[in-house]
Amino acid sequence: MSIKVLIVDDSAVVRQVLSQVFTAASGIEVMDVANDPYMAMDKMKARWPDVIVLDVEMPRMDGITFLKQLMASRPTPVVICSSLTQKGTDISMQAMAAGAVEVIAKPVSGVKGFLEESSHELVMAVRSAAAARMNRVRVMPSASGNPLETRPKLSADAILSAPTGSNVFATTERIIAIGTSTGGTQALEAVLTQLPRTCPGLAIVQHMPEKFTRSFADRLNSLSQIEVKEADNGDRILPGRALIAPGGKHMMVKRSGAYYQVEVVDGPLVSRHKPSVDVLFRSAAKFAGKNALGIIMTGMGDDGAKGLKEMHDCGAKTIAQDEESCVVFGMPKEAIKLGAADEVMPLELIAKAICR
């Protein structure tokens, strides 16, 4: 059965481009379009969508207000479609905290360029959103021959060779590597806001487009006791600090003398993502070994499953979020199937596991 999508955006060009992308994808039906939330609500009286693609800055009623009303009355998967301005990315993070499950960037490179560059990400965002279990979404407090289907799926080999065990140096310093996707913004907020300043350093991959991760990190930093920042190349992984991989870049853990740091690099999509959880986890396996803890959380697909198994095989402790607390039980499920997880636990216990 097709995923029914309602597009809500005040730009006719954006509505047209998004409609074109989704119509070309197998298994997705553009149910209708609306130029503001009032029109959307009228259309939803006759037929309810499976996924709503929502702009955040619109006249008459903004997307955040509409989203909050929707989550209070009939929770429905929402994909935020936002501009790459600072204001746009900040508002998008408010929307994710209010219950949206995915965020995508608005067309900026012209219709032709946008269709070539971003169609895959748009379609994957809608499919991930459609798989979301809305009763697991946490509304956080404020402070077919189609080329989309045939894109080659590269492994972490495209970025980093597999661990051999010979690269791991003895050290007492622990690091935490976390990977997550759909539902992860709320899940990470739930975990990071519980951590004390004395917790081990964290390196985190959350699937998110370029430009949005800085606003996401800034929001978490304002809510947490620990420091949370978008990673820059060469940043040290320190106790009480969480580094979030920039959207559109891969992030790896590297050993540098007596401490760990991150390397932020460009490269191809790995496991169909950039940043890729598999790349982060492989680097943690290779350079931290048993000194690392790997955690795979809510998200669609299998990115991170193989990498977590590599961490496990190199002596790291590994955790998968349980099905009951996941918004989408995809990535953890695949990791569990591979035998990659030492423990399977609910979201509310993960912060304690990090600190024990």
Swiss-Prot record:
<keyword id="KW-0597">Phosphoprotein</keyword>
<dbReference type="InterPro" id="IPR011006">
    <property type="entry name" value="CheY-like_superfamily"/>
</dbReference>
<feature type="modified residue" description="4-aspartylphosphate">
    <location>
        <position position="55"/>
    </location>
</feature>
<dbReference type="GO" id="GO:0000156">
    <property type="term" value="F:phosphorelay response regulator activity"/>
</dbReference>
<dbReference type="GO" id="GO:0005737">
    <property type="term" value="C:cytoplasm"/>
</dbReference>
<dbReference type="InterPro" id="IPR000673">
    <property type="entry name" value="Sig_transdc_resp-reg_Me-estase"/>
</dbReference>
<dbReference type="GO" id="GO:0006935">
    <property type="term" value="P:chemotaxis"/>
</dbReference>
<feature type="active site">
    <location>
        <position position="303"/>
    </location>
</feature>
<comment type="similarity">
    <text>Belongs to the CheB family.</text>
</comment>
<protein>
    <recommendedName>
        <fullName>Protein-glutamate methylesterase/protein-glutamine glutaminase 2</fullName>
        <ecNumber>3.1.1.61</ecNumber>
        <ecNumber>3.5.1.44</ecNumber>
    </recommendedName>
</protein>
<keyword id="KW-0378">Hydrolase</keyword>
<dbReference type="InterPro" id="IPR035909">
    <property type="entry name" value="CheB_C"/>
</dbReference>
<feature type="active site">
    <location>
        <position position="181"/>
    </location>
</feature>
<dbReference type="GO" id="GO:0008984">
    <property type="term" value="F:protein-glutamate methylesterase activity"/>
</dbReference>
<dbReference type="Pfam" id="PF00072">
    <property type="entry name" value="Response_reg"/>
</dbReference>
<comment type="function">
    <text>Involved in chemotaxis. Part of a chemotaxis signal transduction system that modulates chemotaxis in response to various stimuli. Catalyzes the demethylation of specific methylglutamate residues introduced into the chemoreceptors (methyl-accepting chemotaxis proteins or MCP) by CheR. Also mediates the irreversible deamidation of specific glutamine residues to glutamic acid.</text>
</comment>
<dbReference type="GO" id="GO:0050568">
    <property type="term" value="F:protein-glutamine glutaminase activity"/>
</dbReference>
<dbReference type="InterPro" id="IPR008248">
    <property type="entry name" value="CheB-like"/>
</dbReference>
<feature type="active site">
    <location>
        <position position="207"/>
    </location>
</feature>
<dbReference type="Pfam" id="PF01339">
    <property type="entry name" value="CheB_methylest"/>
</dbReference>
<feature type="domain" description="Response regulatory">
    <location>
        <begin position="4"/>
        <end position="121"/>
    </location>
</feature>
<keyword id="KW-0963">Cytoplasm</keyword>
<dbReference type="InterPro" id="IPR001789">
    <property type="entry name" value="Sig_transdc_resp-reg_receiver"/>
</dbReference>
<keyword id="KW-0145">Chemotaxis</keyword>
<feature type="domain" description="CheB-type methylesterase">
    <location>
        <begin position="169"/>
        <end position="356"/>
    </location>
</feature>
